[in-house]
Structures are given as structure tokens and as C-alpha cells.
């Protein structure tokens, strides 16, 4: 039986707390204990986890909950619009400007690289929440020398402007560009998507780990990759504990 906790968002950062409030519906259980883990939102049998940080931190938790038969939906905020807010060490506003950085759903692979074996599980769903956020920087002397003492103090949710739901192999493979040749190299993927070779490598590593991409020889020293028929059987027995 799930056990609700009385402690709410006191220890949470603003972004996580705001997203949880945005997602919560009447009847949901918040910060409920289930199978030894604290669940952000429990909606009937559905577990909803808000993950604003590194996915490696939730790898074991996801494996245990999915292995116990629970449907899990992970909500990951991606800031497609971001404003930089600079404050004094005491929190007084210095200035605010819009960041020119453009973020895209493919960047989620920076996190998915930690959980490729989780993705094919039939009870797993990933939702990328396209958000507008403020990034709060404070001149408190606590940041690194690279930041000249400025610290990244917090993230604030301004709005959720869209979402991308990834449930099936087809959903994840659809993040590959339509004009990608078959087979293809990491460099070709990076060039067409206009991303770094490092991110392209994370994409192919993750999709291979999920069983949706296979090596198809070499082109010179570069490995060639080809999508696997998503309707072919994917064995979950290779990862019995999903850890």
C-alpha cells in the first residue's frame, strides 16, 4: 500500500517543484512511498517521475519499479526558451537577458545514454516537456573560477509550451533525420542534424543499446549503423533486473 509523505517541496529546487505542481491532477498521491522508493506522483497504477537532473541517478530506481510491473512515465524538461537572470549574492536583480541557445529534443540522448536498456520496456514512457525557463545566476563567490565566482543558483519554470512523447521504437527512431542514408556513420548523423559528433555518438550508442540500431560494417575507419526493424522481437531477458 503506498504511503503518502507529509514533507512536500521544502527540499526541492524551484523547477522540480513547479513541474510537479503543473503535472499533478486531483486524486494524485504526491511523494508516495512505493516498493522502497519515493514516487513524485502516483496516479492510480501510473508512476510519474519528474527528472530535472542526470538520468544515471534514477537508473536503479527505474529498473526496480519496471521490474516490479509498474508503468513508469518520466517527465524531462527541455528548455527551448531560456532567460538568464543575474542577481547579487543576496538575491537582488542585476539584469535579465534571453539566451541565444537553441535546444532540441535530440539533446535528450545526453541523458538516455545512461539507460538504453530501459527504453524498450513496454511499461516505460518518456515525455520531453518543452519549456520556457529562467536560469538564476548569483554573484556570491561560490562558483568556479571559470564562472568568475558566479554560481548557478536555480532554474525557474515559466511555461510548458509543448511535449514530445516517446513510447515505442518508432518514436525514438523518428528522432533520426528523414534524409539520413542507410547505413550511416556518426559523422553523417552529426552533419545532417547539425549536432556535435559526441552527441551523435550518444544517439547511436543509446539506440544500439535499446536494440533498435545495429552495426552494418565500416566505411573506412567509421562504423556504419542501420535501423533494426522495430517490429522484430526485443528480448528483455538480457537485462533481467533492468539495472
Short names for language-model regions:
Residues 70-115:
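Long, charge-dense
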Residues 180-192:
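Short acidic, hydrophobic short linear motifs in intrinsically disordered regions
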Residues 1-38:
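Acidic-basic catalytic patches of nuclease active cores, encompassing PD-(D/E)XK
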Residues 96-167:
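Long, low-complexity, charged/polar intrinsically disordered regions in eukaryotic proteins
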Residues 208-219:
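A short, conserved structural fragment
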Residues 195-208:
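Short amphipathic alpha-helical interaction segments
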Residues 19, 39-54, 58, 65, ...:
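Conserved catalytic cores of phosphodiester-cleaving nucleases, focusing on short active-site segments
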Residues 218-242:
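Short, cationic-aromatic polyanion-contact patches
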Amino acid at each position: 500500500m503506498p504511503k503518502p509523505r507529509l514533507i512536500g517541496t521544502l527540499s526541492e529546487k524551484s523547477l522540480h517543484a513547479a513541474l510537479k505542481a503543473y503535472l499533478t491532477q486531483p486524486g494524485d498521491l504526491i511523494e508516495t512511498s512505493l516498493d522502497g522508493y519515493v514516487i513524485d506522483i502516483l496516479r492510480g497504477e501510473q508512476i510519474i517521475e519528474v527528472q530535472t537532473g542526470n538520468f544515471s541517478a534514477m537508473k536503479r530506481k527505474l529498473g526496480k519499479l519496471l521490474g516490479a510491473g509498474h508503468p513508469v512515465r518520466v517527465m524531462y524538461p527541455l528548455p527551448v526558451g531560456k532567460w538568464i537572470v543575474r542577481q547579487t549574492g543576496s538575491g537582488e536583480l542585476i539584469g535579465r537577458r534571453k539566451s541565444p541557445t537553441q535546444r532540441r529534443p535530440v539533446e535528450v540522448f545526453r541523458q538516455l545514454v545512461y539507460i538504453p536498456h530501459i527504453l524498450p520496456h513496454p511499461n516505460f514512457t518518456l515525455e520531453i516537456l518543452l519549456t520556457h525557463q529562467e536560469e538564476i545566476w548569483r554573484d556570491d563567490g561560490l562558483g568556479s573560477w571559470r564562472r568568475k565566482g558566479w554560481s548557478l543558483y536555480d532554474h525557474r519554470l515559466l511555461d510548458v509550451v509543448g511535449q514530445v512523447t516517446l513510447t515505442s521504437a518508432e518514436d525514438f527512431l523518428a528522432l533520426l533525420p528523414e534524409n539520413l542514408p542507410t547505413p550511416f556513420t556518426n559523422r553523417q548523423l552529426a552533419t545532417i542534424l547539425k549536432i556535435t559528433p559526441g552527441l551523435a555518438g550518444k544517439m547511436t550508442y543509446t539506440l544500439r543499446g535499446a536494440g533498435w540500431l545495429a552495426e552494418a560494417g565500416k566505411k573506412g575507419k567509421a562504423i556504419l549503423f542501420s535501423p533494426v526493424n522495430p517490429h522484430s522481437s526485443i528480448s528483455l531477458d538480457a537485462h533481467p533486473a533492468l539495472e
